[in-house]
From Swiss-Prot:
Gene expressing this chain: dap
Annotated catalysed reactions: Release of an N-terminal D-amino acid from a peptide, Xaa-|-Yaa-, in which Xaa is preferably D-Ala, D-Ser or D-Thr. D-amino acid amides and methyl esters also are hydrolyzed, as is glycine amide
Similarity section: Belongs to the peptidase S12 family.
Record Pfam families: Beta-lactamase (PF00144), DAP_B (PF07930)
Activity control note: Inhibited by beta-lactam compounds such as 6-aminopenicillic acid, 7-aminocephalosporanic acid, benzylpenicillin and ampicillin. Inhibited by p-chloromercuribenzoate.
Presence of the UniProt keyword Hydrolase in the record: yes
Enzyme class, UniProt record, top EC level: hydrolase
Keywords from the named record: Aminopeptidase, Hydrolase, Protease
Entry protein name: D-aminopeptidase
Subunit structure: Homodimer.
GO MF term list: aminopeptidase activity
GO biological process terms held by the UniProt record: proteolysis
Length: 518
């Protein structure tokens, strides 16, 4: 490819504080192992007036997952080496148990354990300890799809990997990372700090320019799924290590970034802690990271030997910034979608009975819709009277049915329009035997509220909103991890006499949790 258009790239970077508003951040572009651009702005701590620099360490959150998998490959070998240990770990399982490779590729079908902490009564700013993580993960008995058939993001996959690695090697993951990854890659200040409450070198902020920016409180202990703290310079060193070892047939990043498939042979979007994407016909590998108050993203284009890194100490869209930086570096112009006028027949709520997942659509203006299906809203471009798509989802409408496809997830669902009013007779206590947790629903002044209770405590009351007959939505926008589960979908079941017998509770991260009415 021709040389990078540095003025265009620099103009984009210098506009980041205006376009991604927040306390501070740091970004870099690396090409052919050399630094093209390295920039920090703003403050690491607003109250202390401590400036952000390329040496400032920040939590890289889920970007840590690739490093956990790197330790697995480097110290132990192929994932199958730990399959018997995983069988012992998930010894309560009733369904087909996933393999360790399924964990590495987010194809396990296990429900995300941070989402499950909500159902077990955790407070968003509560303390979450290592023994509580194992308590939750080892009680699991089922998956929300057959392992190897679909993709679903699951932090617990990598928490389990960390436990298995430490058990197999007899060493801490922190020591293994320092010796086998950080030292060879010259990541001089990178460190695993599992307790988020202990990190105080930089402050992460919740909020925005409307509500203001407030220091985020995090008191969770995570391992394997996240936990590494690193500076921009550390992350640059990782990209340079990737470039130095690119010709090594057994090079660590070549192994991490190798293509993966689903059980049916379809290409998978994820492997060994890395997300696979494409832009302008070029394959990208990388990962994002999020915790309350923090966002980061890295992308690597092996074909052109280009990497982009974005680190924010606020909840801005680091993924968007990193991809736009990559496109600028590659000389890819912004896409210009063709949009059609929205047909009102799109708008409303749609249910897939098999998964209990609900799709909500509303007009976003300009030939676009706001869709709520996963952990956060998606903006869909309407390309025809009965077709719409985003970067993740394609919708095709046929009367009162929408065919939803998420190619990367190997997921195809028939969504049925919800029509009619919801009955108000859902108050009561419900029990999940698998989680040993309760859902309490109450009616106050004609409004329905719900709370979760389990081994992690008793949650606040959350309002419920009707989506259709026997289908309700319970939004949870703050939880121990980020992003939060979003909307929990509650689908109620009745017997022949019309009495409620139970409810299926789920979200994209954790589907199909069955509760019986007590």
């Amino acid at each position: 490819m021709p040389n990078i258009d540095l003025p265009t790239l620099e103009a984009f970077v210098h506009a980041i504080p205006q376009n991604y508003k927040g306390p501070g951040g740091a970004v870099a572009v690396v090409r052919n192992g050399e630094i093209v651009l390295r920039h920090a702005w703003g403050f690491a701590d607003l109250a202390a007036r401590k400036a952000m620099t390329p040496e400032t360490r920040m939590p890289i959150c889920s970007v840590s997952k690739q490093f956990t998998c790197a330790v697995l490959l480097d110290c132990i070998g192929e994932p199958e080496m730990l399959d018997s240990a995983l069988a012992a770990y998930l010894d309560q399982f009733e369904d087909g148990r996933p393999a360790v490779r399924d964990l590495c590729n987010n194809q396990s079908g296990l429900r995300d354990y941070w989402a499950l902490t909500v159902l077990c009564g955790a407070a968003p700013e509560g303390i979450f300890l290592p023994d509580q993580a194992q308590n939750l993960l080892r009680r699991l008995k089922t998956t929300h799809f057959a392992p190897g058939t679909h993709y679903s993001y699951c932090n617990g996959n990598f928490r389990i990997l960390a436990d298995l690695i430490e058990q197999h090697t007899g060493r801490s993951l922190a020591d293994l990372l320092a010796e086998r990854i950080f030292a060879p890659a010259a990541m001089k200040t990178a460190e695993l700090i599992p307790d988020t409450a202990l990190f105080n070198e930089c402050t992460g902020y919740e909020g925005d320019t409307v509500r203001g920016f407030l220091p985020a409180i995090n008191r969770i202990h995570w391992l394997g799924d996240a936990g590494i703290c690193a500076s921009l310079d550390d992350m640059i060193a990782w990209e340079q290590f990737i470039d130095r070892t690119r010709h090594d047939e057994n090079g660590l990043y070549r192994r991490l970034s190798s293509p993966q498939t689903f059980a049916d042979g379809a290409p998978a979007p994820y492997g060994f802690g890395l997300k696979f994407e494409e832009t302008g016909g070029k394959r990208l590998t990388g990962h994002g990271g999020a915790l309350r108050g923090w966002r980061c993203q890295r992308w690597h284009c092996a074909d052109e030997r280009i990497s982009t890194i974005v680190m924010f100490n606020f909840e801005g869209n680091a993924s968007d910034a990193a991809l736009k930086m990559m496109n600028a570096a590659l000389g890819i112009p912004p896409a210009k979608p063709v949009r059609a006028q929205a047909n009102p027949g799109w708008f409303g709520s749609w249910l897939n009975p098999e998964t209990g997942l609900v799709l909500s659509l509303e007009d976003a203006g300009g030939g676009r819709m706001k869709a709520r299906f996963g952990t956060g809203p998606e903006i869909m471009d309407i390309s025809g009277e009965n077709e719409a798509q985003s970067s993740m989802t394609t919708l095709r409408r046929d009367g009162d049915m929408i065919h939803l496809a998420r190619k990367d997830e190997n997921l195809h669902l028939a969504m049925h329009r919800l029509k009619g009013e919801a009955r108000q007779d859902i108050a009561g206590r419900y029990r999940s035997d698998e989680l040993e947790a309760d859902l309490l629903l109450v009616s106050e002044g004609g409004a329905i509220y719900g709370a979760f209770e389990g081994f992690l405590g008793k949650s606040d009351m959350y309002p419920l909103y009707a989506a259709g007959p026997d289908v309700w939505l319970l939004p949870v926008q703050r939880s121990m991890d980020a992003p939060s589960p979003g909307e929990w979908k509650l689908v109620f079941h009745r017997d022949a006499a019309g009495r409620i017998t139970g409810v299926t509770v789920g979200c994209w991260l954790a589907r199909g949790v069955e509760y019986k009415r007590l």
